[in-house]
């Protein structure tokens, strides 16, 4: 499993780096990041789309046509639309979530920011996001861009991943720790 994860990470880094260079040359890093965010939202909202990108059952031709149609329907054109088609043609759709995350990280580093992935049990308000950014900026010493994901299974609290650091204040983790402590006592 670690080898597969490493392979995906390597593929994701290479593709994200190439896309970033193209976006930088075209002076469109912000619009590419926005289009990737829209595609990521489609991906997180559709079980069928996730199956399309991860299943080896679909031929590269089927994936190419489907991704092209989805990108066109979502208004994702230009550099990102073409990029998605190339990724589909090369049968690397399975790496798209990693590519998107790697692109965000490269873009943030280019802007002198650090990126943090935040998992919350519910949607964060803009005020909560701003407060979290300010707190993380104090810890990192740099501007922080946050990517928020909602996962109701953590029950409450947050999980923040920033660089090599992870802060887990989720209720699920606290309950698991309490459960282990009670098992040790009894």
From Swiss-Prot:
This is ATP synthase subunit delta. GO terms for molecular function: proton-transporting ATP synthase activity, rotational mechanism. Belongs to the ATPase delta chain family. The gene is atpH. F(1)F(0) ATP synthase produces ATP from ADP in the presence of a proton or sodium gradient. F-type ATPases consist of two structural domains, F(1) containing the extramembraneous catalytic core and F(0) containing the membrane proton channel, linked together by a central stalk and a peripheral stalk. During catalysis, ATP synthesis in the catalytic domain of F(1) is coupled via a rotary mechanism of the central stalk subunits to proton translocation. It is found in: Cell inner membrane. GO terms for cellular component: plasma membrane; proton-transporting ATP synthase complex. F-type ATPases have 2 components, F(1) - the catalytic core - and F(0) - the membrane proton channel. F(1) has five subunits: alpha(3), beta(3), gamma(1), delta(1), epsilon(1). F(0) has three main subunits: a(1), b(2) and c(10-14). The alpha and beta chains form an alternating ring which encloses part of the gamma chain. F(1) is attached to F(0) by a central stalk formed by the gamma and epsilon chains, while a peripheral stalk is formed by the delta and b chains. It is a peripheral membrane protein. Keywords: ATP synthesis, Cell inner membrane, Cell membrane, CF(1), Hydrogen ion transport, Ion transport, Membrane, Transport. Pfam families: OSCP (PF00213). PROSITE patterns: ATPASE_DELTA. Its main location: membrane. InterPro entries: ATP_synth_OSCP/delta_N_sf (IPR026015), ATPase_OSCP/d_CS (IPR020781), ATPase_OSCP/dsu (IPR000711).
């Amino acid at each position: 499993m670690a080898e597969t994860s490493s392979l995906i990470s390597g593929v994701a880094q290479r593709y994200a780096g190439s896309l970033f260079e193209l976006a930088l040359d075209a002076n469109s890093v912000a619009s590419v990041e926005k289009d990737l965010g829209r595609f990521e939202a489609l991906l997180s909202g559709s079980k069928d789309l996730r199956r399309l990108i991860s299943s080896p059952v679909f031929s590269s031709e089927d994936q190419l046509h489907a991704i092209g149609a989805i990108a066109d329907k979502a208004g994702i054109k230009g550099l990102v639309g073409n990029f998605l088609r190339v990724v589909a043609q090369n049968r690397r759709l399975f790496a798209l979530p990693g590519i998107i995350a790697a692109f965000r990280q490269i873009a943030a580093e280019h802007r002198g920011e650090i990126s943090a992935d935040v998992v919350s049990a519910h949607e964060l308000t803009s005020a909560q996001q701003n407060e979290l950014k300010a707190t993380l900026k104090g810890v990192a010493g740099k501007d922080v861009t946050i990517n928020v994901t909602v996962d109701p299974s953590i029950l409450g609290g947050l999980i923040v991943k920033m660089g090599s650091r992870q802060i887990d204040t989720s209720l699920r983790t606290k309950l698991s720790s309490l459960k282990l402590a009670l098992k040790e006592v009894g």
